Amino acid sequence: MPRSSATARKSHSNRQENGAAGSGKKVNKQKSNGQLNGNANGSSAPISGPSSQVDWPSSRSNSDTAINSTVATATKANGTTECSKADGNGRGYLNGYVKGNPDMSYGQANGAVPQNGGLTGQASRRTESSKRSGSNTSINPLQLASTILKSCPMYDTIAILIFLLQLPPMVLTLVQFLFASLTFMPPGGASAGSLTSNFDIFQGPAGTPSLGTMIAMDGFFLLFWGLFMWTWAQNFALDLAHVQVAITLGGGGSGKNGGVNTLCVGIVLVLHLIRSKGIQDFVLGHLLSAKVISPDLLSQYSHLLPSEFRRTEPQSSPSWIRSLLAVHILAQAGTAMARRSMAKNRAPAPPRTGKRVDTEASAGSQTQIDSAFESGTSVSSYIGADGQLITPATHKDGRDRLISAKKRRRQANQVRNRQPFWAALASTKVTVMREYEHSRALSKTARGLTMTEEDLQGVSLDDGLVWITDVDSSSIKFAAGDLVSEDAGVSGSCESGRLGEDMEPFYVCVNGALWATVTICKVQDVAKGSSVVHWRGEISGLAPNCAYTCSFLRSDTEEEICVMSVKTPIANDAEQVVSSVSTPPQPSYRPSSPTTTLKNSIVNAELKLNEKRTRLRKAKNDHKLVVSKIRKELDNYNHRLHSGTDENRQKQRSLQLERNIKQTEEATAVLEVQLDNLENIPEEELEEWSAEKAKYEHELELFNSAKEDVATARSAAAREVSQLESDLTSTIQRRERLQGRRTRVNEQYERIISANAQGLNERERRAAEQFAREQDQAKVEANFNEQFASISQSVQEYQLRTNQLWQQCVAIEQALQQQQQQQILLDSAPLTPEGNLPGTNTLSEAPTLSLGALTTSASSNRSLLGLSFPPLKSSPLQHASSPIGPTSSRPTSPTQAPSYLQHFPASPLINTASPFESDFIHRDRSFSNRSGHSSLYGSDFFDSGRRPPFQFDLSEKVVDKRRSSGSESNAPNLGLRPICSPFPRAGSRASGSGSGGSGSGSGSPSSATGKGN
């Protein structure tokens, strides 16, 4: 939103705004709200300074009679015309109202004009009061510069954007809502009257977009938001809304700061690209794949990045409230950009020549405004080229102004560098308050439609009302309410004759000069209270494209009603006049002095008079030419009229016309006959046509049959070609297969030849290995023979000792039985009819108890009825549990006794069934168990009940071992009985050990075989 330099300067500075007043003096400001073309900023418009003022009482007194007579004559002569003209223009734009001071005293409406002395006294009193009111303590320039900040839209915008991006989402939503409710959309920069109807679409009555345009743009952006924007784009658009808020509040949208938009959008875009998870994965993946950076380096420095940049999950969609606010803000931003672009394209191009231009015409240019703003001088109100109320500065002269401007600029930069954010907030506050006052002022005068004078009904007009109705290149039209004072005391003091019935209650001064060419007329036939328009007037004799300060003063009290600053527009091409006004050497940023204004008005009037004379001469010449041309045409018509009265010529002409008619009729009849003949076809031609048609059809059939034959032949040829191609392909494939087979056969042949060449050496090596293996096997067999001999001797010893033990057991059992019988006989009680007495029969309580349970204890100490026997040192049953115990463990053998003990006398307590089933007992030995020949769990061991007594044939075993030697993977011989060793097996088949009663040995057949191989 472009800042209004006038309001900004007024808000920061309270220096003298009424001209080059003396230091320490302050002239009282008049309250004013003058507006033009629907644009206002709510700032007061001060009166002209002393340098642009004249001695009104003296000038009034010197020319009072002449002016009064002139005004009265002009009013009487042109009263009806001007009033009707003003009434016709009554529906012009209402440009505001300006009220006088509250302490202003009004004279009587029809009072007399005071004398010169009275006017001088009133003027002097007013001057003294204004001096007293303005004699405040002067402000130190250093203090003033320290409180004024130079306009820096870029810094302000970036500071506000950074602040907005740090706010939480809830506060951001509130800020966007407040911004959207205010809808700060400034005008595009050009007046609406200079644009075509295309721009009027974006132009509302108060300089803002119309309601229909806002709704349409919001709907279009909302549709685009929902259809085409994904989640990342929606979040980016939310931050773009923050950018728009920052640009608007920071003033970054002004014409010479267009780069702020690009910078802010670029900052937000870079932040979103860095925070995007997809882009991070893409960039890091390519950097790692290209080995530009290593994963270790990345993990080492990744913790330095903020947590916001390390996203682990994609962004979520914004809420619908923030989406609607962002859509509205972006839509209004797009509308403002379109309006500015259209206004810039339609605005007149600035002159590029080195000629001097009128300073008053260029007083409202943006460059001069910026220069005036940077100089920091005080200003007075006038209308700029863009239609806004601008207040240019009152310049200092020479070196003092340049030095003070540099100091002020340097101190302002120091303040901004120390506290940039607070400077931005201060600038934002000024901008917001100015726009708020602007909108509030416009809401009183422009509420959606063009304001008319009828809309002022009900407005309080106690202090009077003056407003501009039309501004032309050479005139300003205005209207006023009832400005007649009702103060009876003042009216009683007024002498009769000073203000008559036809005199106006106010007069107009332009640029401090009493303007004589002002036409003021009173509206006739206006009922009291029915209309607010009581006076209409026109200020004429003005120059185009110049700034004027129009002061409205009361005729009775000489007090100002209001002061309006107006800039006349550029004259049209048809009314363009080359100005011959001399341009001052120094450009002026305020309205001209009264003398200069009068001179310019006189020169302009003379130029207009000369132009009108020139146009009159040209019109006279044109009229003469037109009159002569009309006279020539009249003479021609008269001559033709007089020459057309001859009857003979008329008769000849009629005969000629009749002859032409007859010839035309005859030609028409001939053409009709020819048409009838063309409709009837001759029979000969019809027969010939039929014959030619039949011939054509026959030829066509032949042609079609020939085409079919050609197509058939082509298809047959194509099939043959395809078949041949397939045969060729199969032949090529077969040839390739044969070539591959030939290659493989050749390779096999070469390998066979090489193997045959190396065959003798291989046989010798194998024979040597076989001989060494046989020697090893012979050694192993000898070792086994020794072990077998020692084992057989141990077995015989065990058998002898076992027989002795069984004999001892039988003897003990017999002794025990005899002892029990004797005890029964000794302890027998007298018999009773009921039987034995309770407690007399001790052994009958356990009739089913086996004798082994009474005589057998744990196998570890082998005790029997208190008699302990030492355990056998090398008994094969040393680790076997008692066959009677139900919970005995069997770590080395099943409960069934080995087969070599069956020929010994068996105990009646040893008949126990095998816990293994028949399938397990008779299962085949696995080939992976290489030590199956010495296994304790062989099938012959479990089937020992069907075997004869233990017999061991060592010679047969040796023969079988020799047959099975030489190969580790040979199957076991079916004719050889497995060795039922009573000793526990070793844990590995590669090595084994055994011990007997009288010998020991190491090794196993399988281990020996493995070593031999």
Curated annotation (Swiss-Prot):
Q: Where in the cell is it found?
A: Membrane
Which residue intervals are annotated with compositional bias (Gly residues) in the record?
Answer: 993-1002
What UniProt keywords apply to this chain's record, in alphabetical order?
Answer: Coiled coil, Membrane, Transmembrane, Transmembrane helix, Ubl conjugation pathway
Coiled coil (residue ranges): 596-782
Which segments show compositional bias classed as Polar residues?
30-65, 875-899
Signal peptide (UniProt feature, chain positions): none
Chain intervals for the UniProt region annotation (Disordered): 1-65, 105-137, 339-367, 875-902, 953-1013
UniProt membrane topology term: Multi-pass membrane protein
Q: What residue spans carry the Low complexity bias annotation?
A: 1003-1013
Q: Point to the regions of Basic and acidic residues compositional bias.
A: 954-965
Of the GO CC terms on this record, one is: membrane
Transmembrane stretches, start-end: 158-178, 211-231, 254-274
Q: What's this protein's function?
A: Component of the regulatory network controlling carbon source utilization through ubiquitination and deubiquitination involving creA, creB, creC, creD and acrB. Involved in resistance to acriflavine, and required for normal growth on a range of sole carbon sources, including fructose, cellobiose, raffinose, and starch, and reduced utilization of amino acids, including GABA and beta-alanine, as sole carbon and nitrogen sources.
Similarity-based family: Belongs to the acrB family.
- Name of protein: Probable ubiquitination network signaling protein acrB
Q: Which organism is it from?
A: Aspergillus oryzae (strain ATCC 42149 / RIB 40)
